[in-house]
Structure formats: C-alpha cells, structure tokens
C-alpha cells in the first residue's frame, strides 16, 4: 500500500469534511451548490485514497488524466451492505 498517497488524500478529505461541517453549522447562507462542490471534493479524495492505494510512488506522482478519472470514481470492490 502506498501509505503516503493514501494519507495525503485522507487528510484532504478530512479537511473538506471539517470545513463542510463548520460551514453548515455557522453559515446560514450555505446552500445546495456549495454542498455539491464540497461533497464532490470530499468523495474525490476518499475514492482516490481507496482506488489508488496500491499504485507506486512514481505513478501517483505522474498521475495521468486517465488515472485521475479512474481513481476518483466510486469504488466497485467494497461491500457496502455491512
């Protein structure tokens, strides 16, 4: 597992989640559009952490456009019925 890559993306996701929670609590004008942008950003990082967990450091650094699109998709190899 590429722990550095996973940790980077989980940290980014955590920061977005913290920011979103803060904005929902403190900003009465926070709207649907802002929420969509925040959740898209959050899922991008969570999904990338999972989908690219085993890529080499070199591949993570070079990250092609195809890699970027593939890694940010919802995982297909996680059982969500638990």
Regions found by a protein language model. Name each.
Residues 15-26, 44-58, 76, 80:
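Charged/polar positions within long, soluble alpha-helices
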